[in-house]
């Protein structure tokens, strides 16, 4: 795959696909974390004389955070110390004229890509190549730089459609992500411990199955809803209140899959030995084998318990490789952040090379000032797909583009 230093950019028009999809409250962006993550790429391109066309999506139609990229332009302008012009168009006449009139060192950002219907669907590279978006913009572009790792598991026109038409290059963030995740996945150092939590149970089961079957993991520690599904798969009763919640979420049907994983890899999958419930507005820890587990019938599980945290901590401190995705509980409520904070602090204190991803995981790391983690990934679904052994469409497109244009390096 091409790296950003493989080409010179003076006077060249560069289409930069970033992922600036950010949390929004009351119509305003509340975090600039994703903007800061792509700054090194943007700065490199501008410093080297590129005419820069930035593009991103923001949410999806009919959701509350589905807004224009006008504020994205303002945030980028502030962080860069130079104007990034908001272009209220995607591939229409106005956008094309503005791209054609760019001067070296100038930057614009196109309108929210998902305002275009073509950008909402996943399609093959061949189909994406034929979209109006790609056909209209390709003649105006010299290079495509992709820094949207968080969207690398999607196959949409802006992400893969230019791969066979123009050199498609990894941005600095993409390069860092691919290098870190590959190091964790391919490492032969042991023990290799995966921590799977949160609510993306099906994705986590795919990861567990893949890394255990391929010998990439020595132990899997579970929490969040992933931990509850594996606990049920081991034959424990989590009570009516929690069974009903999992049923409403459509997760009970995944218990059979978890059982199959346990049938094959039982000793390597660890589940919580205690849980914390919301007992009349307060945290109450209940041992899975204790007499108080009848409380599970009435009160929801919102975290793993302290005994589980200690057991997990011992394992993590002795690990050589750690991959973690998803929180251990409802960390947004401070009394139920014990599991998430305890486990992530242990990861930070461990001498292991560690990779942590997922939006909620990252939020908890920053909220509780957890340090010492080797790599915090911007990808949630993309990271899970990577460790599930799936080929990410954007990485596939980068490889295809490299094979097609490798003779043009340093032109």
From Swiss-Prot:
Gene: pgk
EC numbers: 2.7.2.3
Swiss-Prot/TrEMBL GO biological process terms: gluconeogenesis; glycolytic process
Gene Ontology terms for molecular function: ADP binding; ATP binding; phosphoglycerate kinase activity
Family: Belongs to the phosphoglycerate kinase family.
InterPro entries found in the cross-reference section: Phosphoglycerate_kinase (IPR001576), Phosphoglycerate_kinase_CS (IPR015911), Phosphoglycerate_kinase_N (IPR015824), Phosphoglycerate_kinase_sf (IPR036043)
Pathway in which this enzyme or protein is active: Carbohydrate degradation; glycolysis; pyruvate from D-glyceraldehyde 3-phosphate: step 2/5
PROSITE patterns: PGLYCERATE_KINASE (PS00111)
PANTHER family, sorted: PHOSPHOGLYCERATE KINASE (PTHR11406), PHOSPHOGLYCERATE KINASE 1, CHLOROPLASTIC-RELATED (PTHR11406:SF23)
Transmembrane segments: none
Residues engaged in binding substrate: 19-21, 34, 57-60, 114, 154
Compartment(s) of residence: Cytoplasm
Name of the molecule in the record: Phosphoglycerate kinase
Pfam name, any one: PGK
Organism (species): Thermococcus kodakarensis (strain ATCC BAA-918 / JCM 12380 / KOD1) (Pyrococcus kodakaraensis (strain KOD1))
């Amino acid at each position: 795959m091409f790296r950003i230093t493989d080409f010179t950019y003076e006077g060249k028009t560069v289409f930069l696909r970033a992922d600036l999809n950010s949390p929004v409250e009351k119509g305003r962006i509340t975090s600039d974390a994703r903007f800061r993550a792509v700054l090194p790429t943007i700065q490199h391109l501008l410093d080297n004389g590129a005419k820069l066309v930035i593009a991103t999506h923001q949410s999806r139609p009919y959701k509350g955070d589905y807004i224009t990229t006008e504020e994205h332009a303002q945030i980028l302008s502030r962080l860069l110390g130079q104007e990034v012009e908001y272009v209220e168009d995607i591939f229409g006449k106005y956008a094309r004229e503005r791209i054609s009139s760019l001067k070296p060192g100038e930057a614009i950002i196109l309108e929210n890509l998902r305002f275009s219907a073509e950008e909402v669907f996943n399609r093959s590279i061949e189909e994406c190549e034929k979209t109006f978006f790609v056909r209209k913009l390709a003649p105006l572009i010299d290079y495509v730089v992709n820094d949207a790792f968080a969207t690398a598991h999607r196959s949409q026109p802006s992400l893969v459609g230019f791969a066979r038409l123009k050199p498609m290059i990894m941005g600095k963030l993409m390069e860092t992500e691919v290098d870190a995740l590959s190091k964790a996945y391919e490492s032969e150092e042991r023990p290799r411990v995966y921590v799977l939590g949160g609510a993306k149970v099906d994705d986590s089961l795919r990861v567990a199955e893949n890394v255990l079957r391929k010998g990439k993991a020595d132990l899997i520690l579970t929490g969040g809803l992933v931990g509850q599904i594996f606990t049920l798969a081991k034959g424990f009763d989590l009570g009516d209140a929690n069974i009903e919640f999992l049923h409403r979420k459509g997760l009970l049907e995944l218990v059979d899959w978890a059982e199959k994983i346990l049938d094959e890899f039982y000793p390597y999958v660890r589940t919580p030995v205690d849980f914390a419930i919301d007992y009349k507005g307060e945290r109450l820890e209940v041992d899975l084998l204790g007499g108080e587990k009848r409380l599970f019938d009435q009160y929801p599980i919102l975290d793993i318990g302290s005994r589980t945290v200690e057991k997990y901590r011992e394992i993590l401190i002795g690990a050589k490789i750690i991959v973690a995705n998803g929180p251990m509980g409802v960390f947004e409520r401070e009394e139920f952040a014990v599991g998430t904070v305890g486990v992530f602090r242990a990861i930070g204190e461990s001498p292991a090379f560690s990779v942590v991803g997922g939006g909620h995981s990252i939020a908890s790391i920053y909220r509780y000032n957890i340090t010492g983690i080797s790599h915090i990934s911007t990808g949630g679904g993309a990271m899970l797909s990577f460790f599930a052994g799936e080929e990410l469409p954007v990485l596939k497109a980068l490889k295809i583009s490299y094979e097609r244009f490798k003779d043009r390096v340093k032109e």
